[in-house]
Design a protein with these regions (language model features):
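Short beta-strand element of the alpha/beta-hydrolase
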Residues: 56-68
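Primarily recognizes the serine-hydrolase "nucleophile elbow" in alpha/beta-hydrolase
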Residues: 136-208
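N-terminal cap/lid segment of alpha/beta-hydrolase-fold proteins
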Residues: 23-56
C-alpha cells in the first residue's frame, strides 16, 4: 500500500444526568465542571456498564470537539459511535465543552492578519484553559470513577485538536497553563485529527512531549498541514511541521495526500484500529516507535496544497 515507514476546576454543581444506552451497554453521565460568567461548561462521561463495578483503574480519552472556535458540540452525533467504540475497548471517554470565543466576534475585527492572529490566539488560550479545567475535574474524580489519572489521553478534532495539542505544548514548555494542573502532570498521549499548535516563532520544546498520533491531509485549507505564519511571528504550525521537529520521538503520523479537512473526522470511523494500535503500543505499552503512514489515491494526481495565510483566513471566516 503506497509508501509506508516504520513514524479539568472543581465541580460547580452536583448535577449529574445519567443516560444508559442499553443497545450499546454504554452508561453516559453528564457533569457541570465549571461556570464561567455566562458559560456553563459540561462534560459527558461514557463507560461500559459492565465495567462500572470493576476494580481496575481504566485509561481515559478526553475529547474536544471541532468547530473553528465558533461553534461545535461535545455531543455531536457524528462522534458518538467513536466514543462507544473506545468505551467498548475499555476506555472511559470524556467529551468536554470549552468556550468558543470566536462565535460572537464581528468578522470585520479580524479580517486582517494582525486582527485574525490576535483573536485566534485568545480563542485558543481560552479553549486550552477550559480543557485543563476538564482535566483537573477528571483527576479529582479519579477514585470515584475508577480511572487512572496517569493514563489520560488528550484527543480532539480540528479546533479541538488544536486545543489538545496546544495543551501538551504548554505543558512541555512549563507555561502558566502547566501550573493549573497537578505538579509533574502530563497527558499519556495525544490524538489529533487535523490539528496544529500556536506559537510565536518556531515552536520550541523544553521537554519531550508524550506520544502523539497526528492525522492530517496535505490539501487541508482550514488547518495548515505545515504552517501558516503571520510575518514570521505568530503562526499555526501543523502536523507536518510538528512531525519533522519530533521525528525521533514516539509519534504515529498519518498523512493523506490530496485530502483536505475531512481528516478532522474521518479517522474516527475509518482508522479506529490504527488508533487502538497507537494506544496499546505507544501509550499504554510505552513502545519507542516512530510510525509514518502515507495514504495515496492514484486517482488524485493534481491538487492545491500551497495555501497562504490569507487562504486560511478566508476559509475560517465562512
Amino acid at each position: 500500500m503506497g509508501k509506508r515507514f516504520i513514524f479539568i476546576l472543581m465541580a460547580c454543581s452536583l448535577l449529574s444526568i445519567t443516560t444508559v444506552v442499553h443497545a450499546q451497554h454504554i452508561d453516559k453521565q453528564t457533569y457541570i465542571f465549571a461556570i464561567k460568567k455566562v458559560d456553563t461548561l459540561k462534560l459527558d462521561k461514557y463507560v461500559m456498564i459492565d465495567q462500572i463495578q470493576g476494580t481496575q483503574s481504566k485509561p481515559v480519552i478526553l475529547f474536544a470537539f471541532g468547530g473553528g472556535f465558533k461553534g461545535g458540540r461535545r455531543d455531536n452525533p457524528d462522534y458518538i459511535s467513536y466514543f462507544h467504540f473506545l468505551a467498548r475497548a475499555g476506555y472511559v471517554v470524556v467529551s468536554t465543552d470549552y468556550r468558543t470565543q470566536l462565535k460572537d466576534i464581528d468578522k470585520s475585527e479580524y479580517s486582517d492578519l494582525q486582527g485574525f492572529s490576535s483573536a485566534l490566539q485568545q480563542a485558543i488560550t481560552c479553549a486550552v484553559e477550559d480543557f485543563g479545567d476538564a482535566t483537573n475535574y477528571i483527576i479529582e474524580h479519579s477514585v470515584e470513577w475508577q480511572i487512572n489519572p496517569a493514563q489520560i489521553i488528550a484527543c480532539g478534532s480540528s479546533a479541538g485538536a488544536i486545543t489538545a495539542l496546544q495543551a501538551e505544548y504548554e505543558i512541555c514548555n512549563q507555561t502558566a497553563f502547566a501550573d493549573r494542573l497537578p505538579a509533574n502532570f502530563n497527558y499519556a498521549g495525544v490524538i489529533s485529527f487535523s490539528g496544529a499548535i500556536c506559537a510565536n516563532g518556531i515552536p520550541k520544546w523544553i521537554m519531550s512531549p508524550c506520544p502523539l498520533m497526528l492525522f492530517h491531509g496535505d490539501a487541508d485549507s482550514t488547518v495548515p498541514f505545515t504552517k501558516a505564519v503571520v510575518e514570521e511571528e505568530m503562526g499555526l504550525w501543523g502536523s507536518n511541521f510538528i512531525c519533522m521537529q519530533l521525528k525521533e520521538k514516539e509519534t504515529a503520523y498519518y498523512i493523506a495526500e490530496g485530502i483536505g479537512h475531512s481528516l478532522s473526522y474521518s479517522p474516527m470511523k475509518d482508522n479506529r484500529h490504527d488508533i487502538l494500535s497507537f494506544l496499546n503500543r505507544l501509550v499504554l505499552g510505552k513502545e519507542k516507535r516512530c510510525i509514518t503512514t502515507v495514504e495515496k489515491n492514484p486517482e488524485i494526481s493534481r491538487y492545491k496544497s500551497d495555501f497562504t495565510i490569507e487562504d486560511y483566513i478566508r476559509e475560517n471566516m465562512r
